Curated annotation (Swiss-Prot):
Binding site for GTP: G55, T56, G57, E98, R102, D146
Classification via NCBIfam families: ftsZ
UniProt xrefs under Gene3D superfamilies: Tubulin/FtsZ, C-terminal domain, Tubulin/FtsZ, GTPase domain
Organism of this sequence: Wolbachia pipientis
One MF annotation (Gene Ontology) recorded for this entry: GTPase activity
Record carries keyword Cell cycle: yes
Disulfide feature: none
Protein name: Cell division protein FtsZ
Bilayer-crossing regions: none
Lineage: Bacteria, Pseudomonadati, Pseudomonadota, Alphaproteobacteria, Rickettsiales
Domain of life, source organism: Bacteria
Oligomer status and interactors: Homodimer. Polymerizes to form a dynamic ring structure in a strictly GTP-dependent manner. Interacts directly with several other division proteins.
GO biological process, one term: division septum assembly
Amino acid sequence: LCDKKIQLGINLTKGLGAGALPDVGKGAAEESIDEIMEHIKDSHMLFITAGMGGGTGTGAAPVIAKAAREARAVVKDKGAKEKKILTVGVVTKPFGFEGVRRMRIAELGLEELQKYVDTLIVIPNQNLFRIANEKTTFADAFQLADNVLHIGIRGVTDLMIMPGLINLDFADIETVMSEMGKAMIGTGEAEGEDRAISAAEAAISNPLLDNVSMKGAQGILINITGGGDMTLFEVDSAANRVREEVDENANIIFGATFDQAMEGRVRVSVLATGIDSCNDNSSVNQNKIPAEEKNFKWPYNQIPILETKEYASTE
């Protein structure tokens, strides 16, 4: 999957996992942080992907994000000035069947991670049921989620590297994503009549994302990709369809790129940042949580090891 892999916390974990303990994941990342930073220290942009609720993702992701935030990447421009690494978190939340405790641990991990990333995109695994049917295999469901992320992130990078009539660079990306908090990302692809509108509507209604609304977005990045047959009117209609969903004062950055492999089709990718989170849509039934537990919040570094209610009541 990647050219360079780093084993976290060799001394701490002895080659094993974190045992679903965030403190172990945190310690493993801290043990290996110098090696991690050696690989990312000169990066302009960093994507941190993790599954929240377990040990490694919940514990290690915030450590890496914090180190990246404190680092400075030397940008070789006119003044060779130093700029921080633009850090984007792309993480998942547990399935409902994984239990209340794991969901609460995930939420604590998200709170910690959000302190250090510029932009955070959250995908609840439970939302895979929105796009699955009775015949969808377990592996296929995860592949669908991976594809949404891959195409959406590619929409961001394509703006910087793909040729087009309206080209953008990293400075534009940084404007939309730096210090923006929660975000949503979506992509849609269509062909035939009204393909541009259909692609735009698919992009702004990503069923996998956490309950978030584009209405309050502070920054919007729109990338429209098509073949040589993509028309000006199609670009206009797709961009306007996305614009209708956001506040008129939002900072909208737009790009259009060409890809000969897209002949006959149009793809629209949307990244909305600085959005307000709606009610949490986790599958955990809050009515089933005892009142004393519902109002109780564990400090991030004091998440209990045992899952029993008796253990929690003694803390």
